[in-house]
Amino acid sequence: MNRLAVTDANIFIDLIILGLIEHLFGLDIEIHTTREVFDQLTARQKEILTVFYADGRLTVYDFSWEELAEIFTLDFPAGLEPADRTVFYYARQLACLVISGDNKLRKHCEKKGLEVHGLIWVFDQIVALELIRKTIAVEKLEKLMSYNDRLPADEILKRLKKWSAK
């Protein structure tokens, strides 16, 4: 595994809700996040992720005071949460992929030349690697659409149609 990704809280939360979090760690990607992101999670979500942290599949990075000071001197779009700023900074330091469900963070990463993908991309990878059956992916995407209206409905509908085809 040599590809790295820094992940935000939205990705973890949605995958935990959908019961698919273990599949994120089944991708051929080394998953990282920041302490600031980890601290946004509920106690139950942290407990679930601690299993992956304990076995080395999740890296939670703790910034030094100097790094935190530098992060807060950087120019970010208005309204970008401090935890999301740490995702950008850490990914830039690692020169790696960002996996995020936050539109402001995604746009900032793209503007600054970082590769960035979201939850739909994660689904694509999970299905391509056959970590779940397409029928299960369809069920999970339908559930996702029932509570998360921030996702691109057109992209989800394409996958629902493609993965439902016999």
Give the predicted meaning of each segment.
Residues N2-C96, N103, L114, L141, ...:
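Active-site-proximal, substrate-binding regions of enzyme catalytic domains
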Residues Q45, R106-K166:
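Acidic, PIN/NYN-like endoribonuclease modules and their adjacent C-terminal/linker elements
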